[in-house]
Amino acid sequence: MIGRLSGTLLEKHPPQILVDAGGVGYEVDVPMSTFCRLPGLNEPVVLWTHMAVREDAHLLFGFAGRAERELFRQLIRISGVGGKLALALLSSLEPDELARAVAQEDIKTLSRVPGIGKKTAERLILELRGKLGSLPSADLLSPAPAAGAALLVENDERADISQALQALGYSAREAEAALKSVPDGTDVATGIRLALKALARP
Protein backbone atom coordinates (compact mmCIF):
# COMPACT_ATOMS: atom_id res chain seq x y z
CA MET A 1 0.00 0.00 0.00
CA ILE A 2 1.14 3.56 -0.71
CA GLY A 3 1.04 5.67 2.47
CA ARG A 4 3.11 8.66 1.40
CA LEU A 5 3.96 10.14 -1.98
CA SER A 6 6.81 12.54 -2.71
CA GLY A 7 7.49 13.88 -6.16
CA THR A 8 6.88 16.69 -8.64
CA LEU A 9 3.46 18.19 -9.26
CA LEU A 10 2.79 17.92 -13.01
CA GLU A 11 -0.93 18.66 -13.39
CA LYS A 12 -3.79 20.14 -11.37
CA HIS A 13 -7.33 19.51 -12.55
CA PRO A 14 -9.41 19.57 -9.38
CA PRO A 15 -10.14 17.29 -7.70
CA GLN A 16 -7.42 15.21 -9.40
CA ILE A 17 -3.71 15.93 -9.64
CA LEU A 18 -0.79 14.16 -11.33
CA VAL A 19 2.43 13.60 -9.39
CA ASP A 20 5.66 12.32 -10.94
CA ALA A 21 7.56 10.12 -8.47
CA GLY A 22 10.61 8.30 -9.77
CA GLY A 23 9.46 8.57 -13.37
CA VAL A 24 5.99 7.18 -12.63
CA GLY A 25 2.94 9.45 -12.87
CA TYR A 26 0.42 8.95 -10.06
CA GLU A 27 -3.15 10.22 -10.45
CA VAL A 28 -4.30 11.34 -7.01
CA ASP A 29 -7.73 12.54 -5.90
CA VAL A 30 -7.51 15.27 -3.26
CA PRO A 31 -10.06 17.23 -1.21
CA MET A 32 -10.27 20.95 -1.86
CA SER A 33 -8.68 21.59 1.54
CA THR A 34 -5.53 19.91 0.23
CA PHE A 35 -5.84 21.35 -3.29
CA CYS A 36 -5.70 24.86 -1.83
CA ARG A 37 -2.35 24.04 -0.21
CA LEU A 38 -0.64 22.63 -3.29
CA PRO A 39 2.50 24.27 -4.69
CA GLY A 40 2.77 25.48 -8.26
CA LEU A 41 3.27 23.16 -11.22
CA ASN A 42 6.69 21.49 -11.52
CA GLU A 43 7.30 22.14 -7.82
CA PRO A 44 8.06 19.42 -5.21
CA VAL A 45 5.03 18.07 -3.38
CA VAL A 46 4.55 15.61 -0.50
CA LEU A 47 1.21 13.95 0.23
CA TRP A 48 -0.03 11.50 2.84
CA THR A 49 -2.03 8.95 0.91
CA HIS A 50 -4.72 6.31 1.23
CA MET A 51 -5.02 3.61 -1.41
CA ALA A 52 -8.39 2.01 -2.12
CA VAL A 53 -8.33 -1.26 -4.05
CA ARG A 54 -11.50 -2.21 -5.90
CA GLU A 55 -12.26 -4.87 -8.47
CA ASP A 56 -12.43 -2.28 -11.25
CA ALA A 57 -9.83 0.25 -10.09
CA HIS A 58 -7.01 1.15 -7.72
CA LEU A 59 -7.68 4.65 -6.36
CA LEU A 60 -5.19 6.90 -4.61
CA PHE A 61 -6.36 9.70 -2.32
CA GLY A 62 -3.92 12.36 -1.15
CA PHE A 63 -3.87 14.73 1.81
CA ALA A 64 -1.73 17.61 2.99
CA GLY A 65 -1.30 16.09 6.45
CA ARG A 66 -1.73 12.93 8.48
CA ALA A 67 -4.63 14.28 10.49
CA GLU A 68 -6.62 15.04 7.36
CA ARG A 69 -5.96 11.51 6.12
CA GLU A 70 -7.07 10.07 9.46
CA LEU A 71 -10.31 12.05 9.27
CA PHE A 72 -10.87 10.69 5.76
CA ARG A 73 -10.29 7.15 7.05
CA GLN A 74 -12.78 7.68 9.86
CA LEU A 75 -15.35 8.86 7.34
CA ILE A 76 -14.99 5.91 4.96
CA ARG A 77 -15.45 3.45 7.83
CA ILE A 78 -19.04 4.64 8.08
CA SER A 79 -21.62 2.61 6.18
CA GLY A 80 -22.69 4.42 3.02
CA VAL A 81 -19.67 6.74 2.91
CA GLY A 82 -17.16 5.96 0.14
CA GLY A 83 -14.07 7.81 -0.95
CA LYS A 84 -15.86 10.27 -3.22
CA LEU A 85 -18.40 11.20 -0.56
CA ALA A 86 -15.68 11.58 2.07
CA LEU A 87 -13.83 13.97 -0.26
CA ALA A 88 -17.04 15.95 -0.73
CA LEU A 89 -17.41 16.26 3.05
CA LEU A 90 -13.82 17.38 3.55
CA SER A 91 -14.15 19.83 0.66
CA SER A 92 -17.51 21.31 1.63
CA LEU A 93 -17.04 21.66 5.39
CA GLU A 94 -14.07 22.89 7.38
CA PRO A 95 -12.98 20.40 10.08
CA ASP A 96 -14.35 22.63 12.83
CA GLU A 97 -17.65 22.98 10.96
CA LEU A 98 -17.90 19.20 10.61
CA ALA A 99 -17.08 18.69 14.30
CA ARG A 100 -19.65 21.32 15.30
CA ALA A 101 -22.35 19.81 13.08
CA VAL A 102 -21.73 16.38 14.62
CA ALA A 103 -21.66 17.71 18.20
CA GLN A 104 -24.86 19.70 17.69
CA GLU A 105 -26.55 16.92 15.70
CA ASP A 106 -27.03 19.42 12.88
CA ILE A 107 -28.52 17.20 10.18
CA LYS A 108 -29.40 20.24 8.05
CA THR A 109 -25.78 21.37 7.68
CA LEU A 110 -24.52 17.87 6.90
CA SER A 111 -27.30 17.34 4.35
CA ARG A 112 -26.13 20.35 2.32
CA VAL A 113 -23.16 18.28 1.17
CA PRO A 114 -24.05 16.63 -2.16
CA GLY A 115 -24.77 12.95 -1.68
CA ILE A 116 -25.58 13.28 2.04
CA GLY A 117 -29.21 12.56 2.83
CA LYS A 118 -30.91 12.49 6.21
CA LYS A 119 -30.07 8.85 6.94
CA THR A 120 -26.41 9.26 6.05
CA ALA A 121 -26.23 12.45 8.13
CA GLU A 122 -27.68 10.56 11.09
CA ARG A 123 -25.09 7.80 10.67
CA LEU A 124 -22.30 10.38 10.53
CA ILE A 125 -23.48 11.89 13.80
CA LEU A 126 -23.81 8.50 15.47
CA GLU A 127 -20.41 7.20 14.33
CA LEU A 128 -18.37 10.40 14.74
CA ARG A 129 -19.80 11.74 18.00
CA GLY A 130 -16.99 12.13 20.52
CA LYS A 131 -14.25 11.14 18.07
CA LEU A 132 -13.40 14.32 16.16
CA GLY A 133 -12.10 16.19 19.18
CA SER A 134 -9.23 13.71 19.55
CA LEU A 135 -7.78 14.46 16.12
CA PRO A 136 -4.70 16.70 15.88
CA SER A 137 -5.81 20.01 14.43
CA ALA A 138 -2.53 21.61 13.33
CA ASP A 139 -2.79 20.57 9.70
CA LEU A 140 -6.58 20.67 9.54
CA LEU A 141 -6.83 24.43 9.79
CA SER A 142 -8.23 26.41 6.88
CA PRO A 143 -5.30 26.63 4.47
CA ALA A 144 -4.09 29.69 2.65
CA PRO A 145 -3.32 29.29 -1.05
CA ALA A 146 0.25 28.14 -1.60
CA ALA A 147 2.75 30.87 -2.42
CA GLY A 148 3.38 31.17 -6.13
CA ALA A 149 0.35 29.05 -7.01
CA ALA A 150 -2.16 31.85 -7.54
CA LEU A 151 -3.93 32.02 -10.88
CA LEU A 152 -6.40 34.65 -11.92
CA VAL A 153 -9.97 33.47 -12.28
CA GLU A 154 -10.46 33.75 -16.02
CA ASN A 155 -12.35 31.46 -18.39
CA ASP A 156 -10.06 28.41 -18.06
CA GLU A 157 -9.82 28.77 -14.30
CA ARG A 158 -13.59 29.17 -13.94
CA ALA A 159 -13.94 25.94 -15.89
CA ASP A 160 -11.59 24.24 -13.40
CA ILE A 161 -13.66 25.51 -10.48
CA SER A 162 -16.88 24.34 -12.11
CA GLN A 163 -15.32 20.94 -12.86
CA ALA A 164 -14.22 20.57 -9.24
CA LEU A 165 -17.68 21.39 -7.90
CA GLN A 166 -19.36 18.95 -10.28
CA ALA A 167 -16.87 16.23 -9.35
CA LEU A 168 -17.98 16.71 -5.75
CA GLY A 169 -21.60 16.08 -6.74
CA TYR A 170 -23.00 19.54 -7.44
CA SER A 171 -24.96 20.09 -10.63
CA ALA A 172 -23.71 22.30 -13.47
CA ARG A 173 -26.43 24.82 -12.61
CA GLU A 174 -25.37 24.91 -8.94
CA ALA A 175 -21.73 25.32 -9.95
CA GLU A 176 -22.58 28.20 -12.30
CA ALA A 177 -24.60 29.94 -9.58
CA ALA A 178 -21.77 29.52 -7.07
CA LEU A 179 -19.26 31.07 -9.48
CA LYS A 180 -21.18 34.34 -9.21
CA SER A 181 -19.86 34.66 -5.65
CA VAL A 182 -16.24 34.54 -6.85
CA PRO A 183 -14.86 38.03 -7.62
CA ASP A 184 -12.72 38.61 -10.68
CA GLY A 185 -9.03 38.47 -9.86
CA THR A 186 -9.44 35.79 -7.19
CA ASP A 187 -6.94 32.93 -7.41
CA VAL A 188 -8.35 29.51 -8.28
CA ALA A 189 -7.80 27.86 -4.89
CA THR A 190 -9.57 30.67 -3.05
CA GLY A 191 -12.27 30.70 -5.73
CA ILE A 192 -13.09 27.07 -5.02
CA ARG A 193 -13.39 27.75 -1.29
CA LEU A 194 -15.64 30.79 -1.90
CA ALA A 195 -17.86 28.78 -4.23
CA LEU A 196 -18.16 25.96 -1.69
CA LYS A 197 -19.08 28.42 1.05
CA ALA A 198 -21.77 29.89 -1.20
CA LEU A 199 -23.19 26.43 -1.85
CA ALA A 200 -23.23 25.66 1.88
CA ARG A 201 -25.50 28.60 2.68
CA PRO A 202 -29.17 27.79 3.39
From Swiss-Prot:
One of its GO terms (molecular function) is four-way junction DNA binding. Residues 153-202 are annotated as: Domain III. GO terms for cellular component: cytoplasm; Holliday junction helicase complex; Holliday junction resolvase complex. It is found in: Cytoplasm. Residues 144-152 are annotated as: Flexible linker. Pfam families: HHH_5, RuvA_C, RuvA_N. The keyword DNA-binding applies. Residues 1-64 are annotated as: Domain I. One of its GO terms (biological process) is DNA recombination. Residues 65-143 are annotated as: Domain II. It comes from the Bacteria. InterPro entries: DNA_helicase_Holl-junc_RuvA_I, Hlx-hairpin-Hlx_DNA-bd_motif, NA-bd_OB-fold, RuvA, RuvA_2-like, RuvA_C, RuvA_C_sf. Keywords: Cytoplasm, DNA damage, DNA recombination, DNA repair, DNA-binding. Has three domains with a flexible linker between the domains II and III and assumes an 'L' shape. Domain III is highly mobile and contacts RuvB. The RuvA-RuvB-RuvC complex processes Holliday junction (HJ) DNA during genetic recombination and DNA repair, while the RuvA-RuvB complex plays an important role in the rescue of blocked DNA replication forks via replication fork reversal (RFR). RuvA specifically binds to HJ cruciform DNA, conferring on it an open structure. The RuvB hexamer acts as an ATP-dependent pump, pulling dsDNA into and through the RuvAB complex. HJ branch migration allows RuvC to scan DNA until it finds its consensus sequence, where it cleaves and resolves the cruciform DNA. Homotetramer. Forms an RuvA(8)-RuvB(12)-Holliday junction (HJ) complex. HJ DNA is sandwiched between 2 RuvA tetramers; dsDNA enters through RuvA and exits via RuvB. An RuvB hexamer assembles on each DNA strand where it exits the tetramer. Each RuvB hexamer is contacted by two RuvA subunits (via domain III) on 2 adjacent RuvB subunits; this complex drives branch migration. In the full resolvosome a probable DNA-RuvA(4)-RuvB(12)-RuvC(2) complex forms which resolves the HJ. Belongs to the RuvA family. This is Holliday junction branch migration complex subunit RuvA.
